[in-house]
Design a protein with these regions (language model features):
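Alpha/beta-hydrolase superfamily serine-hydrolase fold, recognizing
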Residues: 4-19, 23, 35-351
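Extended alpha-helical scaffolding regions
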Residues: 28-30
Length: 351
């Protein structure tokens, strides 16, 4: 696809600029991603506000409603370092029945992890408490996110699930979410290691950049040397290739055993926090989560994260709607509504 080639060229430009000392990579990539502007829908009233210290953009239908509307709060993707509230799937929402909040959490590396997750919790809590002032039914609020935004949506729902001082989140929509950092040798990692916008090495490098770690740790992490055997044994009931349906394991080859490197584990401890790897949450949390829709793409290194979380939710009797895009790839949502970057597909009808 021309759009993929163009974005790869832009990333090459960002890498070259960084190597020459012209501009840091994350700064230039942020400028590039923010430069792709979606069209604003004329039927919307748009307001820029703050929920606590978190900037948000509110999209309210201009047409009157006889009853309170449903609400959506979106956390954008971008590895916690890129992206903004100025673009996302807002062009594709059915505005006559929804009010829409897009949250701009503070970005890494300027703001250290877990600032991003905490900002998402702050914005969501504020919206749940004040929804009626925006004409929204507080019992019909959906939390939504794509990629890293899907991580933040997942961890936000987990963190708020047992709160009794705020309304319950009605549902979560997770679009090709990143959900675990224990195993980077799942079938989708092997199959899609060099496919599309998000290669396996690029993903792990972005993880390390987000956590303000050195990308020289990438090789050890890809090999699994950051995980002690005790942790592998503890979590294999939730994260293991055997839990992936057989039809998704074509040509899968089990990796060679990795030698544990304690220094790498110490350097990457944040990766095992449930805010960062929500798949590690205990059943006592997962079993109380709201109805969930998970969207996965076949040509995506993160496909199996979604499949594993789907299984965990279903095993805990949480209602799950699963939509799998056979021709989809990681980041496809970013191209919706950008003229030559638009994708006429069934994807839009799922929202």
């Amino acid at each position: 696809l021309p759009s993929i080639l163009q974005l790869r060229h832009l990333e090459w430009t960002a890498n070259k600029s960084a190597s020459l000392g012209i501009c840091k990579k994350h700064v230039l990539m942020r400028m590039i991603s923010n430069g792709l502007r979606a069209r604003r829908a004329s039927e919307l009233l748009v307001k820029d506000l703050h929920f606590g210290e978190v900037p948000v953009r509110i999209y309210l239908p201009r047409s009157p409603s006889a009853s309170k509307r449903r609400g959506v709060i979106l956390f954008h993707g971008g590895c916690g370092m890129y992206g903004s509230i100025s673009k996302e799937l807002k062009e594709k929402i059915t505005w006559k029945v929804l009010s829409f909040i897009s949250s701009r959490y503070r970005l890494s590396p300027e703001h250290r992890y877990p600032t991003q997750s905490l900002d998402c919790v702050t914005a969501t809590t504020h919206f749940l408490r004040t929804a009626e002032s925006y004409g929204v039914d507080p019992d019909r609020i959906i939390v939504c996110g794509d990629s890293a935004g899907g991580t933040f949506a997942t961890s936000t729902c987990q963190e708020l699930v047992n709160r009794t001082d705020i309304p319950k989140i009605r549902a979560q929509l997770l679009i090709y979410p990143f959900l675990q950092s224990l195993n980077f040798n799942l079938p989708s990692h092997q199959k899609n290691a060099s496919i599309g916008l998000m290669s396996l090495e690029r993903m792990v490098c972005f993880i390390l950049m987000y956590l303000r770690k050195d990308c020289s740790l990438m090789e050890a992490i890809l090999a699994g040397s950051h995980i002690p055997e005790s942790m592998n044994l503890k979590y294999r009931k939730w994260i293991h290739p055997d839990l992936i349906p057989e039809k998704f394991k074509q040509d899968y080859k089990p990796p060679l055993p990795a030698s544990y490197i304690p220094q790498v584990h110490e350097e990457t401890k944040e990766m095992f926090d449930t805010r960062f790897s929500p798949l590690l949450a205990e059943d006592a949390v997962v079993g109380h989560l709201p109805d969930t829709c998970i969207i996965t793409c076949e040509h995506d290194v993160l496909r199996d994260d979604g499949l594993l979380y789907k299984k965990r939710l279903e095993d805990n009797n949480v209602k799950v709607t699963w939509c799998h895009i056979e021709e989809g790839f990681h980041g496809v949502l970013c191209f919706l509504g950008y003229g030559i970057f638009s994708f006429p597909s069934n994807f839009c009808s799922l929202l």
